[in-house]
């Protein structure tokens, strides 16, 4: 199934957003509406009294076929804060270990009354397959599909950028560093940044870890990390996706850190008020040092807290009127 078809599956017959499968095909206005809702959630804080009943009586399920800390638990907290009943699916303890397909798993849970599915799967196509079989009134949210898409991560990163740098991205210089080829975060972020009118996007990493499918069209691309740091406003550090990589793409972790690890000395080359982002999990001493990850220019924990607020916004937008 091609990307255009998946994009169209997100909308109902009236053009209303029904699922969140990818940020591709979503308008600037739609992204800004989601970000504005998330910003309102930030203003309400961790105990949003006025939103406790938005999803009251509704069952949602975190249907994860891959490990997760931040995404799974932030979705769980987001749904709870909106009053939903949350089911946490454990693939290792389910009938998928007996051969049941993801589609059959979803349809059975749907028959029990679950109306919102938050899905992570290592195979990109499965998200589209699930969207094709869900019933009317059931909502599907992509929580990470293979190496292709992670829409809510990109949304929380955009919210963090707004907080750090304001709402106008047109003059920003942003640098993505690391394993771009296997990163669903990088792909979704690049689509969001283009839709929101980002200024200069730079990409840096070993040649073997850069995609050659047109994703980097319009980006400034280099293997020279030190040169690319000059004047950068935002650094997005990405981990090596070793679970998706072929052996031998990187000589060693030590070699990678020497060439692409963000240290305090390297960070000093960027703009004085540059901010550092990382979607997690962090591999300390590989793509980033402790000093930088825990330093004053790190917005990494803000990303984590924003994850709850963004995912609340997505849930209430899609399920609040379901």
UniProtKB/Swiss-Prot annotation:
The record's Pfam families line, in alphabetical order, gives: OTCace (PF00185), OTCace_N (PF02729)
Catalysis: reaction(s): carbamoyl phosphate + L-aspartate = N-carbamoyl-L-aspartate + phosphate + H(+)
Protein name (record): Aspartate carbamoyltransferase catalytic subunit
Residue positions annotated to bind carbamoyl phosphate are: 70-71, 120, 150, 153, 280-281
Q: Which UniProt keywords apply?
A: Pyrimidine biosynthesis, Transferase
Q: Which GO terms describe its cellular component?
A: cytosol
The positions making up the signal sequence are none
Could you say which protein family the record assigns here?
A: Belongs to the aspartate/ornithine carbamoyltransferase superfamily. ATCase family.
Q: Which superkingdom does the taxonomy of this entry point to?
A: Bacteria
Q: What EC number(s) would the UniProt record show?
A: 2.1.3.2
Amino-acid positions noted as binding L-aspartate in the UniProt annotation, renumbered to this chain: 98, 184, 239
Protein's job: Catalyzes the condensation of carbamoyl phosphate and aspartate to form carbamoyl aspartate and inorganic phosphate, the committed step in the de novo pyrimidine nucleotide biosynthesis pathway.
Corresponding gene?
pyrB
Q: How does it assemble?
A: Heterododecamer (2C3:3R2) of six catalytic PyrB chains organized as two trimers (C3), and six regulatory PyrI chains organized as three dimers (R2).
Instruction: Write down the InterPro entries for this protein, in alphabetical order.
Output: Asp/Orn_carbamoyltranf_P-bd, Asp/Orn_carbamoylTrfase, Asp/Orn_carbamoylTrfase_sf, Asp_carbamoyltransf, Asp_carbamoyltransf_Asp/Orn-bd
Which EC class is this protein assigned? Answer: transferase
* PROSITE patterns associated with the record: CARBAMOYLTRANSFERASE
Gene Ontology MF: a single term: amino acid binding
């Amino acid at each position: 199934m091609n990307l255009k078809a998946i994009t169209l599956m997100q909308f109902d017959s009236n053009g209303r957003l029904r699922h969140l499968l990818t940020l591709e095909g979503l308008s600037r206005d739609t992204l800004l509406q989601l970000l504005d809702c998330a910003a309102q959630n930030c203003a309400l804080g961790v105990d949003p009294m006025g939103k406790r009943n938005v999803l009251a009586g509704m069952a949602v399920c975190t249907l994860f076929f891959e490990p997760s800390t931040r995404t799974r638990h932030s979705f769980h907290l987001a749904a709870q804060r909106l009053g939903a009943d949350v089911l946490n699916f454990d693939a290792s303890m389910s009938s998928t270990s007996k051969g049941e397909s993801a589609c059959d798993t979803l349809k059975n849970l749907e028959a029990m009354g679950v109306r919102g599915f938050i899905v992570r799967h290592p195979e990109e196509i499965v998200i589209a397959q699930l969207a094709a079989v869900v019933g009317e009134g059931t909502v599907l949210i992509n929580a990470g599909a293979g190496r292709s898409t992670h829409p809510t991560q990109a949304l929380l990163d955009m919210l963090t950028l707004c907080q750090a740098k304001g709402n106008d991205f047109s003059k920003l210089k942003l640098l993505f560093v690391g394993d771009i080829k296997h990163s669903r975060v990088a792909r979704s972020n690049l689509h969001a940044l283009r839709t929101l009118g980002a200024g200069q996007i730079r990409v840096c990493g070993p040649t073997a870890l850069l995609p050659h499918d047109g994703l980097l069209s319009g980006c400034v691309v280099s293997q020279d990390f030190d040169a690319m740091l000059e004047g950068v406003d935002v650094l997005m550090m990405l981990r090596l996706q070793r679970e998706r990589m072929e052996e031998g793409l990187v000589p060693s972790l030590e070699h990678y850190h020497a060439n692409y690890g963000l240290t305090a000395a390297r960070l000093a080359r960027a703009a004085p008020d540059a901010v550092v982002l990382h979607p997690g999990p962090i591999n300390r001493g590989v793509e980033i040092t402790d000093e930088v990850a825990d330093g004053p220019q790190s917005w990494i924990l803000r990303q984590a807290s924003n994850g709850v607020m963004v995912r609340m916004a997505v849930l209430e937008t899609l399920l609040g009127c379901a």
